[in-house]
Amino acid sequence: MNLSLVLAAFCLGIASAVPKFDQNLDTKWYQWKATHRRLYGANEEGWRRAVWEKNMKMIELHNGEYSQGKHGFTMAMNAFGDMTNEEFRQMMGCFRNQKFRKGKVFREPLFLDLPKSVDWRKKGYVTPVKNQKQCGSCWAFSATGALEGQMFRKTGKLVSLSEQNLVDCSRPQGNQGCNGGFMARAFQYVKENGGLDSEESYPYVAVDEICKYRPENSVANDTGFTVVAPGKEKALMKAVATVGPISVAMDAGHSSFQFYKSGIYFEPDCSSKNLDHGVLVVGYGFEGANSNNSKYWLVKNSWGPEWGSNGYVKIAKDKNNHCGIATAASYPNV
């Protein structure tokens, strides 16, 4: 065979193996890499660009359908842009749901005239949005958020609490640090330990380390925890209205949640049982003039303020326990 033909065929094979990218997205790709400080090796660059581009086009398709009234929320590119959904689920899946019988049961107030909307941020109960980064510690952020609120309720002082303290020190209670945990076990740790350090004295580093709890830096305590009736949104609503921010878990493993930006989140494939992410309900409300329509739970996430709506998400409310928002709700007793 003619050597030149062999070489031509070989080069054609190499060229066909190189991913074809949308050149119209080049500027956005370079801007995204600069914003999120991504540096790839030669072999990884093409793969990550392909994943990012697929995600970008999915987002654009969704937002086009949103403008046609097919969805109630928008999506946007963010720090998870170069991750497949499977990679995202593996990295961010941090909630380990377990039966834990040491808690009290929330006694629903009878004949309570509940407000149409609640936002504990406006009352000073909620610290700024934090970022768990690559560590599977969502459970710790959910737990500190609830405890911060209850300590404010008791003392009138809002102090940011140490998630790293929980990550490093609550393994005896059954938590697994950056490999996941359970908010109720975090509350149990605080009770058994006799306190929890402040974020300032025990800062977050997003990796598992040895326990460095110092009693003299403790700024919070609890006497155990209370669980809200599983799956009952009305009970959760009463707890949020009368107690304060509540720790909950949800199914957050979908691409639609990975790139959520604004609006009321509703995912048809969301599970009310298979929960993988701990978050904090800080209120509830509705959009529009009619309080019976477009109801939502106001949820604080732990993926930084750049994700979602300044770090928050509105989850569809009274939609059959959507995404399991009321399946595993609890709060510390202070």
From Swiss-Prot:
Give me the disulphide-bonded residues. Answer: C135-C178, C169-C211, C270-C323
PROSITE patterns of this UniProt entry? THIOL_PROTEASE_ASN, THIOL_PROTEASE_CYS, THIOL_PROTEASE_HIS
Q: Which reaction does it catalyse?
A: The recombinant enzyme hydrolyzes proteins (serum albumin, collagen) and synthetic substrates (Z-Phe-Arg-NHMec > Z-Leu-Arg-NHMec > Z-Val-Arg-NHMec)
Query: Which keywords belong to this entry?
Result: Disulfide bond, Glycoprotein, Hydrolase, Lysosome, Protease, Signal, Thiol protease, Zymogen
What EC class does the entry list? Answer: hydrolase
* GO BP annotations, alphabetical order: antigen processing and presentation of exogenous peptide antigen via MHC class II; extracellular matrix disassembly; proteolysis involved in protein catabolic process
| Primary location group | other
The Enzyme Commission number assigned here is 3.4.22.43
Put simply, this protein is called Cathepsin L2
Q: Which SMART domains match?
A: Inhibitor_I29, Pept_C1
Localization in the cell: Lysosome
Q: Which residues are glycosylated?
A: N221, N292
A Pfam family (short name) is Inhibitor_I29
Show the active-site residues: C138, H277, N301
GO MF term list: cysteine-type endopeptidase activity; cysteine-type peptidase activity; serine-type endopeptidase activity
Entry keyword Metal-binding: no
Q: Which residues, if any, are the signal sequence?
A: 1-17
Function noted in UniProt:
Cysteine protease. May have an important role in corneal physiology.
A GO CC annotation recorded here is:
extracellular space
Residue numbers covered by the propeptide annotation in the UniProt entry: 18-113
Organism from which the protein derives: Homo sapiens
Question: Any known activators or inhibitors?
Answer: Inhibited by CST6.
